[in-house]
């Protein structure tokens, strides 16, 4: 019997936020919806994050209309997901409990199925109220443990050590992340997401965390990452092999680069591994037909230029060259053997073949989320100040 892997599609929220500064209009979303109903994703992230802000600020649209229109089109085929900043909800300052209560109630009544709840500093107190009210009104509370790495402190010199200064003690250990996940599970979380918004987690680390979470927490585990620094696809493969329950992906023309890995590449890996995602890839191909044109429209309206797009690829109808097919096998074998360098190398070669962006060393060093990077690029373009981007990234 084939193992099942659930797929959360991010295209209409994190996908467009990471690659196109969250400027996808309702009319553009509507063009994709008839095919999403047939795609059979476990979940679709469509709301929260920067979507409500951008919908009002830049598009002069109603964010509640966005959610309700998608729910009307998709029904209960896929659970609609939103990203909430804990007590801040979709804003940038904390709200009192009565506001959180009413917001969660209205969200679920408008069609929301899953609320992914996070605090950027992993402060569990800041997610408590949202978990409570989401569950109270019949929603699924998806609590996210935010992945990060320790600051890069220089090793103390000889005289500093003489004065008693010690080496930096690691904070963000496996035990730290597991403890946060356990605290969130104790609050009533229905699932836990390892949320790597900057794409910094390498394959070996995510495999370790997935196994640790699965062993110690009795609820499903989701993995969310980005491809910006060049780990995303390899890390998703490692998470799948380690036994993760859900992975987050984007459709082809909104995938990779600053976004999440492509469902099409994950589909190829899963097929080779004998894993069933339940996703209707014929419907995904129809979504991609729309997204290809929308991508061109957004490149012009957001960035004022046409950006290179990946080679078209439909895993149901296109035959991979033998050497590329062999790279998928090599990546799987390397991930199963815990050969991190070989896994990353094979996955990067796969991405390069399809014309996806090369790893962004600026983002890798600055350690910032892909959505923040794409928004910064768009804002500097608007200000005609693109030349300061490298310096800004250095300062970050």
What are these regions (language model features)?
Residues 1-116, 120-395:
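Catalytic cores and adjacent flexible loops of soluble metabolic enzymes
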